[in-house]
Amino acid sequence: DLVRSRGLGDVYKRQYLQYASRESERLRVGEKQTLATSVIASGFPYDKDVNPDNNSDNVARIIPYVRDVRRLGSAAYDISCVAAGLLDGYWELALHEWDVCAAELILAEAGGVVCDLRRDRGISIVAGNGAIVKEILKYVR
């Protein structure tokens, strides 16, 4: 399983039932327990200008409670950054399997969890360590 960021040169890998790595460095999710000190990321659907479920309401709800919200790259890259402890959490709506499959496995090997929001449109997930996922779920719908 592999996630590659061509622009940054990062390569994230998962060794089946062993560990996840970036450039041979073993990955571990961050240990933060609250959103107040957390940097999290999210994304927006390609049709955000006409889609009423465009995630902007979730950003507005959560932003007062976090240290910062970022938008870095693809869903796979952002989830891999959570696996590396570079981000504390991530959520996004209306994704596809190819957006997240490899990164979810990398995150699991790094000790993280993914929660499926089970929405009507595509795959919608929250990712991070267990505590941060629970915190994000208070604000993301």
PLM regions and their residue ranges:
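Short loop->beta-strand "edge-of-pocket" segments that line small-molecule binding or catalytic clefts
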Residues: 26-49, 63-72
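A conserved active-site-flanking secondary-structure segment within enzyme catalytic domains
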Residues: 10-36
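Anionic-ligand binding region
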Residues: 22-27, 53-60
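Single conserved hydrophobic/aromatic residue that forms the stacking wall/gate
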Residues: 1-12
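Short loop segments at secondary-structure junctions
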Residues: 15-17, 25, 45, 110-111, ...
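Conserved acidic residues
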Residues: 9, 38, 88
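Solvent-exposed alpha-helices and their adjacent loops that cap or buttress functional pockets
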Residues: 5-6, 31-34, 61, 117-120
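Oxyanion/phosphate-interacting regions
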Residues: 57-64, 77-141
